[in-house]
UniProtKB/Swiss-Prot annotation:
GO molecular function: potassium channel regulator activity; serine-type endopeptidase inhibitor activity; toxin activity
Subcellular location(s) per record: Secreted; Nematocyst
Family: Belongs to the venom Kunitz-type family. Sea anemone type 2 potassium channel toxin subfamily.
Protein name (record): U-actitoxin-Avd3h
InterPro entries attached to this UniProt entry: Kunitz_BPTI, Kunitz_BPTI_sf, Prtase_inh_Kunz-CS, TFPI/VKTCI-like
GO annotations of cellular component type: extracellular region; nematocyst
Function summary: Dual-function toxin that inhibits both the serine protease trypsin (Kd=30 nM) and voltage-gated potassium channels Kv1.2/KCNA2 (IC(50)=2800 nM).
Disulfide bond entries: C21-C71, C30-C54, C46-C67
Site location (Reactive bond for trypsin): R31, A32
Residues cleaved off as propeptide: 76-82
Secreted keyword on record: yes
Highest taxon in the source lineage: Eukaryota
Listed Pfam families: Kunitz_BPTI
């Protein structure tokens, strides 16, 4: 049992994905238009989106660099636009 726990902890760290990065993109119900980035677990990239300003989640970053650092993504030429 302890072996399995250690295995999964090491596997999670080796993939470098923070649990917050697996959360879905949430635009929120408010009507502000803040450019933000989120980690898209399907494309395995940080992508740009427009955040409404309220009721978001932790998968919401001010910059592409912050998203890539927190979510363990290597830089790519340019972010995908949504």
């Amino acid at each position: 049992m302890v072996f399995l726990l250690c295995f999964f902890l090491v596997a999670d760290v080796s993939y470098g994905i923070n649990g917050d990065c697996e959360l879905p993109k949430v635009v929120g119900p408010c009507r502000a238009r803040f450019p933000r980035y989120y980690y898209n677990s399907s494309s395995k990239r940080c992508e740009k989106f427009i955040y409404g300003g309220c009721r978001g989640n932790a998968n919401n970053f001010h910059t592409l660099e912050e998203c890539e650092k927190v979510c363990g993504v290597r830089s790519r030429d340019s972010p995908k636009e949504n």
